Each structure stands twice: as structure tokens, then as C-alpha cells.
């Protein structure tokens, strides 16, 4: 359903004065002011016209009352008997006929019955019936005059009446007043066109004044509007440039004392604030650049230091792992040789036991057996010496392995120290990043990565330390086993020497053959037992050597992984 405002033409209800241009608003004020002034002028002109008309009417009323007083004088003369009624009326008619005012204005008298009694200008109307007389507008004006007198005794009547010198009747207003004693009314009128002429003259004078005032108002309004609009355009243009970031703009109008001056001053404050903000922004950007440069420099230094320390450690670990692998390989080979030689010694001991039993069973073959025993004892002695040498070498290799494991332990401790220092540097970097605020967030992430890498390094070195501890334990066992092998081989050498001495004494003490054979059998049994122990120890040493070899390979792999991780981390740090 449409409201009344929606039916207004041109969508007036949608108009909002806030969307008008400032010049249009000033024009609206001027127009409204002029309309108000025009309304006031129109009211004043209407009042002026009414006042002019009222003044003429009052003047006419006064002169008619004067004429009425004159006629009244004659009425009193007739009533007092000083004059007859006819004489008094004739005297009154003569007096009224000759009376003039305002130069040409006159009076007339007609009876209340509608007959003209006297008319100085129109003598042709004397005695005529006036009741049917109409003006060009069709008004029975004499009848109206009689009605006014009968009703109110006096009053004004307007009508159209010919004016001397003019072809057409003009508006006229007459004042009439009744004379009851004689049944007359006396009247006089004024032409309204005189009032209109005077009114038009006043209108022209006032119009000239109003026109001058209007022109002055328009000129002043135009000047004020131009001053305000130019000031507003200057201020808004400067503010728009300030909003676009141009702080070099100069807005004119600081000296103004009006609201535009206040606006310009506020814009100047905004410009100074913008300059301050721009300068602060540039300073913050410079601080961020310096912080970024310092961060990059610090990261580069940390990366270089970390690279130098970690790579040195990794190289040391790799070299140590290589040496440990070589040592383990050599130890495994030596242990294998020792195992083989132990097996040979065991076979020789078994052969010796068989020979001793053969000597006990066949004494008659003692000479030949003694020679065979001598040969076997010599061979056993040689094998025992070789076993001693192999055991000594194995002992040296294992001790070298133990020393290598100790050096690896030192390297692991060095890696742990570096990881601790790296963790401490990461903690310091985290603190510095927290101090740097937003600019240090990226650095904090890097510091956390460094700390995480240090933790992984510490964990890897701990695992390496455990492996090295296991190697050291196994190496210690191998050293003990090798020492036992050495002792056993030493005892075997002593037994072999004893067998040799017994063989040399066979010729001199045959009676002690049985005892020596039993002793030789016991010695052979013991040698066989110790050789079996040596073989088991050698097998265990071989297993330990292989474990050591695997640990060395694992250590080398861990060191390579550590080096790759450090290289990748340093690459990421340098790329930031």
C-alpha cells in the first residue's frame, strides 16, 4: 500500500538535505529568506493598500459628515421656524452644489425613494429614478446606498463610475449618510484608481528597495558561498591528499577564524600526526631491518660455529670408527688364527696322550716312541710358542681396541659437551627472540630447531656411548680371556718342556717310565682341557670382535646421519 509521501511527484520524499551541495544549501537559505521577505513585503503592501484605502475612506467620510452637518444646520433652521422647509432645502442644495474638496471632488444628494436631488456634475440626472441604475458589473449601487442608510444610517458602497477624462468606468467607493428629517442621503466618492496609482508608486519605491536588498543579499550570499565552498574544497582536497598518503600537501586557511579554519587546523594536526606516524613507521622498519640483519648475522655465526664444532666431531668420530673397524677386523682375524692354532694344539695334545698310552702299552717300542714323542713335543713346543705369540698379538690388538673405545668415549663426551653448548646457545637465542617480540618469532623457531637438533645429538651420542660401553665391556672380557689363553699356553709350554726333559732322561731312568707316562698322560689331559678352554675363549673373542665391528659400522652410520642432519640444518639456517 502506497503512503501519501510515495505519491509525491519527482520522489520528493526521498530527498535528504544532507546530500545537497553546500552551495545549494546556501541558495536554499537565500531563497527561503527571499520568499519570507517577499511574503512580508506582500503583507506590508496589502496593509499599505488597505491603509491607503482606509485613509481615503476616512477622508471621504469626514467631508461627507461635514456636508451632513451643513445640511443638518438647515434642518434645524427649518425646525426652529427660522426658515421654511422648502427654503431650507433650497439653501442646503445650493450649499452642497457649490462645495468642493481635493480640487474636483463633489457631493450629491438623493432621496431615500431613489430620486436624484442634486448632482453638480450630472445635472441631467436631477429628478430621475435611480433605483434601476446599474454599473457595468450589473450592481444596483444606488439601491445599495439606500439600503446601507436605512440599515446603518451611514456606510460605504463600492461600484464602477465614469471618471472625467476616461472612456471606461473605474472603481469608486462612496460614503453615504442619511438625513432622516427630509428623507435624503448625502454622499461623496473617491476613485480607487487614484489609490491604486498611489499604491503602485509605493510598490515601485518599495520594489526598488527590495530589489536592491535582494541583489545585495544575493551578492553577499554568493560571496559567502564562494568563500565557504572554496575553503571547504581547499580543506577537503588537502584532507583527501593526506588520506592518500601525501604529507607534503599544504592546506591554506590557517588564519581563518571560522569552522573552516578549525577544519584546516585539524587537518594540519592530522598531517603532523601522519608525518609522525610515517617517521615512526620508517624507524620501526629500520629497526626491523637492523634486527633482521643482526639475527642473520647471529644465525650465521652460530651456524659457522656449530658447523665447525660438529663437523670436527663427526670427522673425529668417523676416523675413530674407521680405526675401530680396522682394529676389530684385525682382531677378528687374529682370534680366528688363535682358534685354529688352539685346535691344532688340541690335536697335538690328543696325539701326545695317544703316544703316552702307546708307551705304557708297548714299552718295547719305547725307543721309537721316544723319538716320536720328541718330535711331537718339539712340534707342540713350537705350536705353543706360536700360540703365545698369537695370544700376545691378540692382547695388543684388544688393548688397542680398548684404547680406541676410550678415545671414542672421549669423542662422545666432546659431542655431549657440544650438544650442551648448542642447547645453551638455543636457550639464549630463545630468550633474545622473546625480547625481540614479533620480529624474533622466526628466530625463536630456528632456536627451537637448534635445541631439538642438540637434543637429538645428545640422544645419539648417548646411544653411541652405550655401544662403546658395551664394546669396552666385551673388550675387557676379551683381554681377560686372552690373558687366560696366554697363561694356559705358558703352562702348556712348561709341560712340553717337561716332556722334553723326560724324553731326554728316558735313557737314564727307564724305571721311572711308568710314573713319567702317567704324569705325561695327566699333563696331556690338562693340556687338552686348557686347549678346549682356549678354543672357547677364542670363539667368544671372535663374537666380541664381530660385535665390535658391527658397533663400529653403526657408529660410522650414526656419525654420517649426524653430519647430514647438521648440513641440512645449517642449510636451512643460512637460507633464512
UniProtKB/Swiss-Prot annotation:
Residues 226-279 form the HAMP domain. Residues 279-297 have a biased composition (Basic and acidic residues). This is Methyl-accepting chemotaxis protein Amb2333. GO terms for biological process: chemotaxis; signal transduction. It is found in: Cell inner membrane. Chemotactic-signal transducers respond to changes in the concentration of attractants and repellents in the environment, transduce a signal from the outside to the inside of the cell, and facilitate sensory adaptation through variation of methylation levels. Attractants increase the level of methylation while repellents decrease the level of methylation. The keyword NADP does not apply. Residues 320-556 form the Methyl-accepting transducer domain. It is a multi-pass membrane protein.
Amino acid at each position: 500500500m502506497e503512503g501519501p509521501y510515495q505519491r509525491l511527484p519527482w520522489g520528493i520524499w526521498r530527498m535528504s538535505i544532507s546530500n545537497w551541495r553546500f552551495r545549494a544549501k546556501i541558495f536554499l537559505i537565500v531563497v527561503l529568506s527571499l520568499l519570507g521577505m517577499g511574503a512580508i513585503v506582500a503583507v506590508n503592501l496589502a496593509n499599505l493598500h488597505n491603509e491607503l484605502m482606509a485613509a481615503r475612506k476616512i477622508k471621504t467620510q469626514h467631508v461627507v459628515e461635514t456636508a451632513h452637518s451643513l445640511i443638518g444646520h438647515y434642518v434645524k433652521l427649518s425646525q426652529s421656524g427660522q426658515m421654511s422647509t422648502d427654503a431650507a432645502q433650497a439653501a442646503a442644495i445650493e450649499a452642497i452644489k457649490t462645495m468642493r474638496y481635493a480640487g474636483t471632488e463633489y457631493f450629491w444628494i438623493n432621496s431615500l425613494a431613489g430620486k436624484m436631488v442634486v448632482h453638480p456634475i450630472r445635472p441631467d440626472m436631477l429628478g430621475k429614478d435611480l433605483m434601476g441604475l446599474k454599473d457595468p458589473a450589473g450592481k444596483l449601487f444606488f439601491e445599495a446606498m439606500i439600503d446601507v442608510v436605512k440599515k446603518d444610517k451611514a456606510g460605504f458602497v463600492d461600484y464602477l463610475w465614469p471618471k472625467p477624462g476616461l472612456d471606461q468606468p473605474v472603481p469608486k467607493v462612496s460614503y453615504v449618510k442619511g438625513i432622516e428629517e427630509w428623507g435624503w442621503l448625502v454622499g461623496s466618492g473617491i476613485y480607487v484608481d487614484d489609490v491604486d496609482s498611489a499604491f503602485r508608486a509605493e510598490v515601485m519605491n518599495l520594489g526598488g528597495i527590495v530589489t536592491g536588498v535582494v541583489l545585495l543579499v544575493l551578492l553577499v550570499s554568493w560571496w559567502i558561498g564562494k568563500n565557504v565552498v572554496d575553503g571547504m574544497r581547499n580543506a577537503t582536497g588537502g584532507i583527501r591528499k593526506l588520506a592518500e598518503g601525501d604529507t607534503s600537501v599544504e592546506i591554506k586557511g590557517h588564519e581563518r577564524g571560522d569552522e573552516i579554519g578549525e577544519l584546516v587546523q585539524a587537518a594540519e594536526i592530522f598531517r603532523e600526526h601522519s608525518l609522525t606516524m610515517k617517521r615512526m613507521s620508517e624507524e620501526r622498519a629500520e629497526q626491523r631491518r637492523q634486527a633482521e640483519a643482526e639475527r642473520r648475522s647471529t644465525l650465521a655465526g652460530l651456524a659457522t660455529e656449530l658447523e665447525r664444532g660438529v663437523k670436527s666431531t663427526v670427522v673425529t668420530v668417523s676416523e675413530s670408527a674407521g680405526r675401530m673397524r680396522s682394529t676389530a677386523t684385525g682382531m677378528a682375524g687374529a682370534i680366528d688364527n688363535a682358534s685354529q692354532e688352539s685346535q691344532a694344539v688340541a690335536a697335538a695334545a690328543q696325539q701326545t696322550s695317544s703316544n703316552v698310552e702307546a708307551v705304557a702299552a708297548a714299552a718295547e717300542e719305547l725307543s721309537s716312541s721316544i723319538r716320536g714323542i720328541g718330535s711331537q713335543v718339539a712340534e707342540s713346543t713350537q705350536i705353543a710358542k706360536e700360540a703365545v705369540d698369537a695370544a700376545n698379538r691378540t692382547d695388543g690388538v684388544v688393548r688397542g681396541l680398548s684404547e680406541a673405545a676410550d678415545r671414542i668415549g672421549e669423542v662422545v663426551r666432546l659431542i655431549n659437551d657440544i650438544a650442551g653448548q648448542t642447547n645453551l646457545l638455543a636457550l639464549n637465542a630463545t630468550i633474545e627472540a622473546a625480547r625481540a617480540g614479533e620480529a624474533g618469532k622466526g628466530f625463536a623457531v630456528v632456536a627451537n630447531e637448534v635445541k631439538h637438533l642438540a637434543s637429538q645429538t645428545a640422544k645419539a651420542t648417548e646411544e653411541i656411548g652405550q655401544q662403546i660401553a658395551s664394546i669396552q665391556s666385551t673388550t675387557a672380557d676379551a683381554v681377560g680371556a686372552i690373558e687366560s689363553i696366554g697363561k694356559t699356553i705358558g703352562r702348556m709350554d712348561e709341560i712340553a718342556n717337561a716332556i722334553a726333559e723326560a724324553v731326554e732322561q728316558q735313557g737314564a731312568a727307564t724305571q721311572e717310565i711308568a710314573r713319567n707316562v702317567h704324569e705325561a698322560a695327566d699333563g696331556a689331559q690338562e693340556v687338552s682341557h686348557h686347549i678346549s678352554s682356549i678354543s672357547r675363549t677364542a670363539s667368544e673373542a671372535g663374537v666380541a670382535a664381530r660385535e665390535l665391528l658391527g658397533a663400529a659400522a653403526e657408529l660410522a652410520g650414526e656419525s654420517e646421519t649426524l653430519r647430514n642432519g647438521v648440513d641440512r640444518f645449517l642449510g636451512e639456517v643460512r637460507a633464512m
